[in-house]
Every structure is written in C-alpha cells, then in structure tokens.
C-alpha cells in the first residue's frame, strides 16, 4: 500500500479510499497526545487548519486536536493542563513548553450573540463535530493510522481552489459574522475563489459585521 508524503500532495489529489493512504507529518507531541487518548479508549484526531495547511504544504501555526473524551477525562490523563475553554469543551495540554488545544466532539446550540453558541452539547460523533465547522477546507481531520477524514469534500474544494461553507452558508454566517471576513481572508491568502452560494451568503449578511467588535475584526 502506497504512502504519500505531504510535499507530493500538491501534484496529485486524493479522494475516497486513497485518503487512508495519506501521510502527513505531525509534531511528535501531538502524536503522543493522540496515542495517550486512544490507549485509554477514546478517539482523537488532529483537525482543522493544521490539516488544511499541511496538505497545502504550509507550516501550521498550531495543532488542534479533537476527541471523544470529555474535558474532565482529558484532564485526568495529562499532568499539565490549562482550562482554556471548558464551557466549549477545550483544554490545553502542555507538552515540553508547547500547548495543544484538545476539544471534545461537540454540537453547537443556537448562536444568540453572533459569536458564541448559547450552549454546546458533547457528542461521541466525529461527523457531528466536523459538521459545525465553517468551511469544507477546515472540516477535515487526520489520524496517523486511519488517514484523512474528509466528509464534506474539502480535498475536492482545495483541488478546485474553492472556499465553500459546510452546510448552509446563511446559517454559518448568521452564527458568526466574522466568518465572512475569514472567507475573504482565505480567498486572498490562498488564491481561492469563493463558491457561489457562499458568496451570496456574504452579500446578504455582510451588514452583520457591524455587530462584530473592532478587536475581533483586527485579530482576523
């Protein structure tokens, strides 16, 4: 069975079962966290922007991990942790002076402030967790043995150089208007085109940006 190095991916794109053969290089500490979680009966994957950037041959700024373990269970398994967002299922695990955000699979409730869900519900389903994410290129998870999990065709969109929302763009942008700026930023940084329905959602809901704080806009 062939294994594909990250640097070879831009020359060819993979779909279906070939995702399983994909090999991304992840930090040893991130892999150690995955292993510890799995040895204790939990699922765990690196997820989101780090997977996207690795496939594109870019160096990720950080490595986020998603898991079926609850925040309390994560804290029991690791000696050094920081409660960075327990209400949203996130614990930062410290390894050799590096921090890795470990977040429980979750389903988001209604967004009442255009930024955060009113409540989150933990789930045992990776699919449900990936479904809540903003864009298809950010909704992929990776495991060193099981390979790439790409339920929303993020690889195909990267191949076509497209920014596309996961699910209904109107819902995604209504949940958090800052995603509008994020779509534009990704389009500019990566040279990708914003997909038609996603672009329409931006056009309709752009006025909601007036409710986003200047600090968040500047950070984005």
Label each residue range with its predicted role.
Residues 2-220:
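Catalytic cores of the polymerase beta-like nucleotidyltransferase superfamily
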């Amino acid at each position: 069975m062939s294994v594909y190095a990250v640097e070879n991916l831009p020359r060819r794109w993979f779909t279906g079962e070939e995702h399983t053969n994909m090999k991304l290089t992840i930090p040893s500490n991130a892999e150690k966290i995955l292993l510890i979680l799995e040895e204790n009966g939990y699922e765990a994957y690196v997820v989101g922007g780090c997977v996207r950037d690795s496939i594109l041959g870019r160096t990720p700024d950080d490595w986020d991990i998603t898991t079926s373990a609850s925040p309390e269970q994560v804290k029991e398994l690791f000696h050094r942790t920081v409660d960075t967002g327990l209400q949203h299922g996130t614990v930062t695990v410290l390894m050799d002076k590096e921090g890795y955000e470990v977040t429980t699979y979750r389903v988001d409730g209604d967004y009442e402030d255009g930024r955060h869900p009113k409540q989150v519900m933990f789930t045992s389903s990776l699919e449900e967790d990936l479904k809540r994410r903003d864009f298809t290129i950010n909704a992929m998870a990776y495991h060193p043995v099981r390979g790439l999990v790409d339920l929303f065709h993020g690889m195909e969109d990267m191949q076509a150089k497209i920014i596309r929302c996961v699910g209904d763009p109107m819902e995604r942008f209504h949940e958090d208007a800052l995603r509008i700026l994020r779509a534009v930023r990704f389009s500019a940084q990566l040279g990708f085109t914003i997909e038609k329905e996603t672009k329409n959602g931006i056009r309709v809901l752009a006025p909601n940006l007036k409710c986003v704080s200047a600090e968040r806009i500047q950070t984005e």
